[in-house]
Amino acid sequence: LVDIALAAWVASRMGKAKRNLWYSPHLKTDYALSDQDSLPGFDDWCVLATPGHTDRDLSVMHLPSKRIYIGDLLVKVKDRFIPPIPVNYPEQYRASILKVQALRPASLMLAHGREVMLTEANYAHVLTVAPRKPFTIWTPAKNKLQRLLLRKKG
């Protein structure tokens, strides 16, 4: 349910119309893929392990064009590239951003947006704002509550 609520929130922030979202929480694996594997049936696409948002995130790179579909590794909100919510594995997330940056892709394709080209400044910004501790949809509310409780004690 959190994923569905989050998808609705992202869609509203992007000005998209509301629509019914529902999918099974139990997914069936068609192919087990690992870092550097070719996509079955698409030899010119390479799998990249890019965990951090979740522990199993994958990106895929079209080798001839050096274009990478990164899924939810980044989102663009108000003309800024930022980490997604949640970032469950912050160290892995930062390593994934550095991995993609090191590949010097021609462009990145976002799950929630269009094809974009990041500058070195964009990558630097993402790494600066990337959380250092796990960050979920509940983290801001928890932090605000802690600040309120500490203020009342003091």
Where do the model's predicted regions map?
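Intrinsic structural disorder
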Residues: L1, H26, V100, P105-M109, ...
